[in-house]
Amino acid sequence: MASQLRLRSALALVTGAGSGIGRAVSVRLAAEGAAVAACDLDGAAAQETVQLLGGPGSEKGAPSGPMAAFQADVSEAETARRLLEQVQAYFFRPPSVVVSCAGITRDEFLLRMSEDDWDKVIAVNLKGIFLVTQAAAQALVSSGCPGSIINISSIIGKVGNMGQTNYAASKAGVIGLTQAVARELGRYRIRCNSVLPGFIKTPMAQKVPQKVLDKVVGMIPMGHLGGPPDVADVVAFLASEDSGYITGASVEVTGGLFM
């Protein structure tokens, strides 16, 4: 999808921006003209993304608005609240686009999964999105600004997967959370949608054995794994006014897997 500068007046906060889908989303939104606040648990990785965008520390000029990196653990309430405060202090406004990409896996079969691995995945993947969405919504409502909140779920949240009861539950929760938020915030001109990637070539997918990936590819009608830019293109659409009458939707980016 070619850039159309649909977001030239937007400020986008992207969590999980240090790699994979989060980095691709940051690049895509910047190409659309948005200023980008790139957040990651790994602050150095977030800074690398900002440099890639042409922000502070880069030898090239920023292609659009100002860019900045932020370090935060989105699973902690105080940290999530402080993140929004820091972003507003830096850019002098709340983010009008919020994309929650931060996520982890701790895979194990149900019979052997530890409570700690369950709690960690739920804390980042579901609680983290709740906290960031809540803080961003509070900032937008207080300022009277419209916005678009986009939560990265997963097709696994819809169909489940062996060895991923924690991950599947967290991503299913994101879908339900997104729909509830869409109902609550529509009156404030704030939209909320989720994106359900399939198997995407990311650092997380690199942990999957090749023979498993080969089997998955054989199940995909498009015949190949997706790339982070495929997800980022959909996010850019949902962030823009081209999707102005879309809220509460769950958009699958799977190449036809599990349809």
Swiss-Prot record:
Task: Please give the residue positions where the record annotates the modification Phosphoserine.
Answer: 58
User: Which N-terminal stretch is annotated as signal sequence?
Assistant: none
**According to its UniProt record, where is this protein located?**
Mitochondrion matrix
This entry carries the following GO cellular component terms, namely: mitochondrial matrix
Give the source's domain of life in one word.
Answer: Eukaryota
User: Which amino acids does the record list as binding NAD(+)?
Assistant: 13-21, 40-41, 72-74, 167-171, 200-202
The UniProt entry, under SUPFAM superfamilies, shows: NAD(P)-binding Rossmann-fold domains (SSF51735)
In short, the EC number is 1.1.1.n12, 1.1.1.62, 1.1.1.239
Oligomeric state and interaction partners are given as: Heterotetramer with CBR4; contains two molecules of HSD17B8 and CBR4.
- Keyword Oxidoreductase on entry: yes
Q: Phosphoprotein: is it a keyword of this entry?
A: yes
UniProt name for this protein: (3R)-3-hydroxyacyl-CoA dehydrogenase
User: What GO biological process, any one, is recorded here?
Assistant: fatty acid biosynthetic process
Kindly state which keywords UniProt assigns to this record, in alphabetical order.
Answer: Fatty acid biosynthesis, Fatty acid metabolism, Lipid biosynthesis, Lipid metabolism, Mitochondrion, NAD, Oxidoreductase, Phosphoprotein, Steroid biosynthesis
The pathway noted for it is: Steroid biosynthesis; estrogen biosynthesis; Lipid metabolism; fatty acid biosynthesis; Lipid metabolism; mitochondrial fatty acid beta-oxidation
Residues annotated as the enzyme's active site: 167
Q: Give the record's family classification.
A: Belongs to the short-chain dehydrogenases/reductases (SDR) family.
Modified-residue entries (N6-succinyllysine), positions: 158, 171
| Catalytic class of the enzyme | oxidoreductase
Q: What is the recorded function of this protein according to its Swiss-Prot or TrEMBL entry?
A: Required for the solubility and assembly of the heterotetramer 3-ketoacyl-[acyl carrier protein] (ACP) reductase functional complex (KAR or KAR1) that forms part of the mitochondrial fatty acid synthase (mtFAS). Alpha-subunit of the KAR complex, acts as scaffold protein, required for the stability of carbonyl reductase type-4 (CBR4, beta-subunit of the KAR complex) and for its 3-ketoacyl-ACP reductase activity, thereby participating in mitochondrial fatty acid biosynthesis.
